[in-house]
């Protein structure tokens, strides 16, 4: 796992289009330290346990998050689920998974990711989820279709901003994970839950500790 943040940082800094005083590059000392850390480790590196995750997301506003959490308790009881619901402040739609590593993300990487995300131009938009269902990995989620086009557009633009070689749209199924449970639930319609997406958030998650830190917030254009 070790080194994913490093390679991501190297990739971002090799990409064209951000030259100038706003572009921050890793220090030579930082680069040498990373080379020493990952050079010649072989199987040892593979055995390291990932502790830190970075991902870009869209979050519901606090009022909507509280509403989702309240509904989750009812859906959990109605479907006989036993998994622990996510905290309201942890509810989100993942846009792009940056990576997992065995150390906290360096400031240089956070800065580079923030700069790339800031290059995404898109107005605030409304999202609406109208069903619940089981998803991969035992997740019980909010899902939708027709009213999630804005998330598809934002995810593609953000992916292009982060990718040295923008290409066709990646597979992306917008959803909000509510809890995890081994019992699978077929798709069920619900009264729609909606909010206005106003910003992109870069989240630093401490794996296994249920700790999320919003390290960067990039506002979308306001109408």
Where are the regions a protein language model picked out?
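Histidine-dependent nucleotide/RNA phosphoesterase domain, centered on the 2H-phosphoesterase fold
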Residues: 2-223
């Amino acid at each position: 796992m070790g080194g994913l943040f490093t390679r991501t940082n190297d990739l971002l800094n090799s990409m064209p289009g951000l030259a100038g005083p706003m572009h921050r590059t890793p220090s030579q000392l930082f680069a040498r330290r990373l080379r020493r850390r990952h050079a010649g480790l072989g199987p040892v590196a593979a055995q390291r346990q990932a502790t830190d995750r970075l991902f870009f997301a869209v979050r519901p506003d606090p009022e909507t998050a509280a509403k989702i959490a309240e509904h989750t308790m009812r859906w959990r009881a109605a479907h006989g689920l036993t998994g622990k619901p996510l905290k309201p402040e942890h509810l989100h739609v993942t846009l792009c998974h940056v990576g997992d590593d065995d150390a906290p993300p360096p400031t240089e990487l956070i800065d580079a990711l923030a700069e790339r995300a800031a290059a995404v131009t898109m107005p605030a938009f409304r999202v609406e989820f109208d069903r619940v269902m089981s998803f991969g990995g035992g997740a019980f989620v909010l899902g939708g279709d027709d009213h999630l086009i804005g998330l598809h557009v934002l995810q593609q633009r953000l992916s292009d901003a982060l990718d040295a070689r923008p290409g066709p749209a990646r597979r992306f199924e917008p959803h909000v994970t509510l809890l995890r449970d081994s019992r699978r639930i077929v798709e069920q319609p619900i009264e729609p839950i909606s909010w206005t997406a106003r910003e992109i958030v870069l989240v630093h998650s401490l794996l296994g500790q249920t700790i999320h830190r919003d390290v960067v917030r990039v506002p979308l254009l306001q109408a």
